[in-house]
Amino acid sequence: MNVLFLPQSGALGPSSRYRVYQLLPHLRAFTSEVSPAIDDDLYRAIYLTGHGSKLAALYATWKRRQADWRRVRDFDVVFVQKGFFPGLYAGLEAAMAAQRPLVFDFDDAIWLPREGGSPMLRALHRERAVQTILHRATAVIAGNDFLAEYARRFNANVTVVPSAVDVARYPRAAGSTVVGWIGSRTTLPYLKPLADVFRQLGITPRVIAAGTPDFPADFRPWRLETELDELAQLGIGLAPLPDMPWERGKCGVKILQYLACGIPVVASPVGVQRDLVRHGVNGFLAETPEQWRDCLKQLLDDAALRQRLGAAGRALVTERYDVSVAAARVAKVLAASAQTKGMTGKL
């Protein structure tokens, strides 16, 4: 079976890396071709350095996807990751779905305009465009139950495949007391409300990110080639999130990364984070500043507790959130979709 994978970006983009590229070695039963909408150079310019134009990304996506549309009949199944222009336009996906079975995968609440995003894109955002893709797809893969619940309003053939990590690649953390966070330029603001907690505890958090924080931090620039080594130096992982609709759709990859290294986590009880972090078992859930302070202090003061919670976290990820588990589920969806002759799962 021949599958055309259409990710949003090259492997430098985290969503495409976790939802497509890391699965490919585990999908060798399929003949596959990967056609990213934008390459790593353009992704780096726009999302890592902040010097590129998102209009350039839209233009590159349009050119690439028009070329892909002309050749979809050469494949048995088309796998679309997150859409070409989520919330803006769904015409190309609909045209592809009319020619070949189309599997649509998404790991964010893309039907919502993102807070803090481009004012122009927010103004142009149309939820109907996302609904059209969900309606036309042969099958939908959602990164968590919150996303799946929305998708099932428009398509009966929805499978939940949580985001996963390749546990074997993650080194075990050394057991330090370094309190740290890993994330993107756009998610750095999630960490800032904890500034007073850090000050009260005398902590300077280590921040591994593409953007520079505007609060006191031990900043380490994020690089794909050094990411795992940087993670392994942490002793406690942070995952604060505001309880908002967009954040409820997130898939908790940073928590999976911490746990894969055997690092205990303190996280906000928002969305999938409530499922990944088992309070007192592999980390702690904290809502108020007082809870954050108390949970962090407890972990900082007790090396045995950090070790016990970290071991439980790595065991959980190995059993339920390893890339091999996710790839097996995706393989079933692809195989079933190829047998549908282009039928959709629309309601």
What do the predicted segments below correspond to?
Residues 279-290, 298-304:
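Conserved acidic donor-binding segment of nucleotide-sugar-dependent glycosyltransferases
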Residues 186-189, 221-260, 267-275:
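Nucleotide-sugar-dependent
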Residues 11-26, 35-36, 164-170, 174-232:
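Conserved catalytic-core segment of nucleotide-activated headgroup transferases in glycan assembly
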Residues 298, 305-320, 326-329:
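A short, well-ordered alpha-helix in the C-terminal region of glycosyltransferases
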Residues 5-73, 211-212:
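N-terminal strand-loop element at the rim of the active site
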Residues 62-75, 86-88, 92-98, 104, ...:
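Membrane-proximal helix-turn-helix segments that form the acceptor-binding/catalytic region
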Residues 323-347:
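C-terminal alpha-helical cap of glycosyltransferases
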Residues 103, 110, 135-170:
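Donor nucleotide-sugar binding/catalytic pocket of nucleotide-sugar-dependent glycosyltransferases
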